[in-house]
Amino acid sequence: MLTPQRSAWSLKSKVSSEKPRSKGKGITKNLDSAATPFPPLGLLNGGDLDRGGEDMEAWKRFKDEGLLDESICYKKDRESLASRIIELEKDLHEYQYNMGLLLIEKKEWSSHFEEMKMRLAEAEEILKREQAAHIIALTESEKREDNLRKALGVEKQCVTDLEKALREMRSEIAEVKYTAEKKMTEAFALEASIEEKRLDTERKLHSADAKLAEASRKSSEINRKLEDVEDRERKVQRELNSINSERKALEKDISEQKEHLREWEKKLQDGQNRLLDGQRHINEREERINEAEGGLKKKEEELEEAKRSIEGTRNTLKRKEEDLDVRLRSLVSKEKEIELKMKNLQKKEKDLHEIAEKLDHREREEIQKLLDEHRATLDTKKREFELELESKRKSVDEELKSKFAAVNKAEKEVNRKQGLISEGEKELESKMDKIKIKEKDLETKSKALKKWEESLKSDEKKLVAEKDQIMKDTHELKVSINELESLRDALNAEQHQIAEEREKLEISKEEREQYIQKQSELKQEIEKYRNMQEELSKGIESLREEREKFEKEWESLDEKKITLQRETKKIHEEKEKLEKWHHKDQERLRNEEANAKADIERQLEDIKLQKEAFENTMKHERLMAQEEVARRLADVTRELELRKHDLEMNMQKKQEEIERKLQGKEREFETRKEAELSRITSLINLNNSKLQKLRIEQDRLDREKEEVELQKKKLQEDQSEIQRDVDTLRQLSKNLKNQRAEFIKEKECFLAAAERCKTCQNCGVSISELEMVGIIQSSAEIENADIVLPSLTDDHIEQHMKNKGSHVTSPQTGSRVFGSGFLQKCTKIFKFSPGKNAETSATTTPLVFGEELDIAASEDAAANDNNPAADVERVTVNPSLVFGEQLDTAASEDAAANDNNPAADVERVTVNPPPLAPVATEQNETEESSLPPENDSPPKQRGGRQSTRRGRGGKTVRRTRTMEAVVDDAKAILGDTLIVEEAKESSQQNDEQSQGASVHTGGTSNTRQKRRRAPASEMTNSEHDVEESESQSQSISIGRGRRKKRQTSAASEVQAPVVERRYNLRHSTVAKNSVAATLAVSDQAKVQTKASHQASHDNNQISMGDDPALEGSHKVTHTVQKTTTASVMEVSSKPAMEETHEENIVVRSVEISEMSASEEAEGEVQGVPPIAEEPATPSSGSSTSGDIGNDDDMDDDDEEERHNASIGKKLWNFFTT
């Protein structure tokens, strides 16, 4: 079958190409073939073989003697090599020709197979026709039997029943087929989906690797941007979140894929179970069919017995039987042919099954490997995502291990092949020279082989798909064969039934009744049978369609097989040259041996056809062919050895390079991993530290917020209390306005008394008319003045709260709070003596009574705030000409009581001026007069001073008011504009509570208090504004000393107007403009006369220096007795807790800012009235302790209170009731 016809070959070429091969070496062989003449053609016809042998021997001798030239031999060698190459090319063409023949034979076999299919189809059609004819015959016989004895009706029913049963069976079989096909398609679809999912998983893994690379890149960028800590933390958190989310998403995808795979495996198992169940159902149905056939056989026996009774129908039945016998014989002959064809088909199917089983086995192994690999990769990826960098190292190790395993396997295969190849090493050593020449050709062929291998890989994938299709086709063929066998069995059964029915027709008359009874059953069975036949016909049609499809697919498969066979043959040829590539070289050698044998057989056949004489020559040719095969094998083995050696070297080099690269990558990976881990740990530590700091700050802020809320609550309460106080003040002002008439009346009485007592009873000094004029003017101004209601402004409160802060008063200062101080100062204002009414009216500027109340209330409110502003008291002294002789105590006390400025109550003031710079401008002077908050004396000194005044506590109503209540009242009136700096209170509270104000009454060393100069740079604008406003306000001296002063009318006329001052919680907007508005031209003239009068007395008095900085530098304390300059004494103090006296003496550092007599002309200070200091005698002011509240002062106070009982008690009773 496989021997091609080679008519184109000539005997001459064979003899010429093979005859010289009997020599040992290829070169001599070629030289012999080229140099020696060919034997004559006559030898072929005759038997002169000996002559040819003699000629050969002669040529050999000639050659051995060395008569040939070397150049000719070299040329002949080259020609022989070229001829050898040509011969090899011819061999290749021959091999290709053989491949073409094989393909042609394959086509022939495929055509033969198609013919067999066509024959089968024709046989099936004949069978169908015969079945139809048989059914027609049966119907005809039934009709005749109905016409004769109505017996054939029962047979028809039986046939219909049988047909129905068959139809049901066929329908069930078709359904089972359809379900099986669906399941197979689903299985293939699932396989495709699994592959797609695998690809998706690989893509996702690549994307995950890319994302990991991106994460590393981002981490590097984060390490570069170490400047902004917050941005770095956010980026790190975002990256961590993204990585976690990606990891979770990948884990979810992997879990879903695992679930899909598990579901797919479950579905496959379910499909297999269903197929098994379907097969079981088919087997059960076949058993049922067999049982039905047994029942039918019984019924047929009964029918035969009934037929025996029918004698009239025997002849017709015999004729029909003969016809049926003839047809059955033809069917049997056709069935035998079909069986032969089926056997052939079965053989081919077995071959296909074997191939399919091999392919299935390989596919299963590959699929299992793929599944194992995928599972391993999935597990490794999980671990990688969970363990991050550590898992990467493990995965790299696993990959390296797998690669090393693959390399080891390849090495084992190479070693195995080396063992096989080492056997032919001895034979291949002799042909090294030829192989060197062929190395170039082999290199080109190796490149082609690589290309072929790549094409083979793609073809193998195609083969896998085609194998699947072949498996499907084989399965369908099996099903169709089984159906044909079942049809054949059914036909045999039907034949047996017909024969039995014929026998049963000969039943005796006794059994006719039973036959009639069973005819109905037989009719039903016949109907079933007809149904079965219809189903069979449908199944046959479906089988035809399937056969057509199968034929089409088979044709496509044949075409693919042809192409694949071509490619496989080419692959086999190349594999025969190289055993390393899956034993391709061994197959090539086998094909060459087979080709050599085929050539020998062809030659033998040609020689046998031509002559028997060529048997000897054919034997010789066979020997030559064997030698050629051996030589070729030796050449191939030599080539294989060289190629193997080269490949081994290349593999070793590649392995070394791969190992080096892997080691370098591992080192880089470890270094990067360590660097990233260190960076991540550093970032984590930084983040943790920052988080801890942020938590601490957050806790601190929460605490501060709580404190602020508490302070806000306190402030609200203080605002409410302030509002209440304001309401009370307004009510008091209204009451005072109503009582002004009474006061005017009393004042008129006082003026009348003053006119009577123009001369002092104690000292005999007469009161000048100028002082009386001042008293009259002051009384007129008081009558004409309107009482202005106290009011609050937002600006003052805001500035006050910003500069001073809101502090709770200490327990020591709690007794002297807002209500008590205010009432005391009100009593001081309204204590007028009849003797001094005219002097006060002449010396003081027109001051509204309500404004004095506001001033007193503001000072008490400032004292209640427990801030430095509460400890600053301004002692304003009305300037007057002090005479050498002192008035008596009663007259001086009355004059002090009638004075509107309560600062005149200070008897002796010890001044310790601050070390301030000289006054240059109005602004500098106002700045020098102000003090920072931290320069005040502690509140303990005030407590000591208050303890000396408790003797008069019964005559005053003291209201305990806290700073919180005052602030709450102010906030309730002003709204939420009050800004309280609560954060500064905790740091300033202890310092500010320890601050107080004290007055130095003596220049001795008992005070022992250092004077600290506050630099001008420490003073803020807010402090300057507050102290400037306080310098304009009139505060009342706390210490009640001896009031032994005499004020002349000239001095009172020269006095500048007192700045109007409202409640201390706001700035006074009228203060700066009130001086210019209240001064008259006549007053200015009087001021000039006063200045000249004061200049004459400056030599006799120890007065304050105009340069406060000079006085502060020397720290000289002056006892002021007489002065003619207007000055404003600002009382302030610095905290000097370590230098306070042990006797708890109240010390007030008085800061005096002086103005010269030329103040009116120059206008350096606006809003500050020039006030003369009080004269003090040495006998009354020689105490060095500076304590104002001593026993002498208390006695003088008691005398004053008894003397002023006529007016003071009334006013006091008015304010206290």
Curated annotation (Swiss-Prot):
Keywords: Coiled coil, Nucleus. GO terms for biological process: nuclear matrix organization. The keyword Transmembrane helix does not apply. Residues 1-45, 892-969, 981-1057, 1087-1117, 1152-1217 are annotated as: Disordered. Residues 159-746 form a coiled coil. Residues 892-904, 1173-1186 have a biased composition (Low complexity). The keyword Membrane does not apply. InterPro entries: CRWN. This is Nuclear matrix constituent protein 1. It comes from Allium cepa (Onion). The gene is NMCP1.
